[in-house]
UniProtKB/Swiss-Prot annotation:
The keyword GTP-binding does not apply. Its main location: other. It comes from Candida glabrata (strain ATCC 2001 / BCRC 20586 / JCM 3761 / NBRC 0622 / NRRL Y-65 / CBS 138). Component of the biogenesis of lysosome-related organelles complex-1 (BLOC-1) involved in endosomal cargo sorting. This is Biogenesis of lysosome-related organelles complex 1 subunit KXD1. Component of the biogenesis of lysosome-related organelles complex-1 (BLOC-1). It is found in: Endosome.
Length: 203
């Protein structure tokens, strides 16, 4: 019996063992599945990029740490690191306030005001005197100009009279020297040889 079973040709049944209609996928479900697959693939790609970027950043950070260990960092500031902050050493506002307070305490404002009032009074009095002198000069200047003009005219007249007297004396000398030569010479010698007294010298 068993041999007969083995001798029979093995045939495969073509009838489906499972109802395939119950497992058919409609078009809408197919689209949803494909969309979900694409989104999942995109998410996987984004995660891959993020992991790559994180890997790159970690690698760059490790390189920077390696360079920091090899090359010592130099301080660009002129102040050493162990020195305190300059702002704590010197406060400009406090210094200005203290200097103003000291100056106000050292100065006596009453004396300063008194000196200022005295100085202003002296300046005002001197300015009034100067104004009075200017007014007097303006009044006297025309008078002095008129006197100077009259004096120049008088000077011209006196000079003219002196020239006339000189010419007359010269004419008289010529006439006397011609008409009376002996007497003229004697008189001239007497005048030249005479000695002046003290009173005459003073005069």
């Amino acid at each position: 019996m068993s041999d007969e079973i083995e001798d029979r040709p093995r045939t495969r049944s073509r009838t489906p063992s499972v109802d395939t209609q119950s497992y058919t996928i409609n078009e809408e479900a197919h689209h949803i599945i494909t969309d979900s697959d694409s989104s999942s693939s995109e998410n996987e790609d984004g995660e891959g990029n993020e992991t790559n970027s994180s890997d790159d950043s970690s690698e760059s950070g490790s390189v920077e740490r390696f360079l920091d260990e090899i090359v010592p960092t130099t301080s660009t500031s002129f102040i050493p690191n162990d020195t305190p902050d300059p702002a704590t050493l010197f406060d400009i506002t406090e210094y200005i306030f203290d200097s103003i307070v000291q100056s106000t305490n050292a100065c006596d404002f009453s004396e300063a005001f008194a000196l200022q009032a005295k100085t202003s009074a002296v300046i005002n009095s001197k300015s009034m005197e100067l104004k009075n002198l200017i007014e007097q000069t303006k009044v006297r200047l025309p008078e002095l100009q008129a006197k100077f003009k009259n004096g120049t005219q008088t000077l011209r007249t006196i000079r003219k009279n002196l020239d006339n007297a000189k010419s007359r004396i010269q004419v008289m000398n010529d006439v006397l020297q011609t008409d009376y030569p002996i007497e003229f010479n004697q008189a001239r010698d007497k005048i030249l040889e005479r000695t002046l007294d003290s009173d005459e010298e003073v005069i």
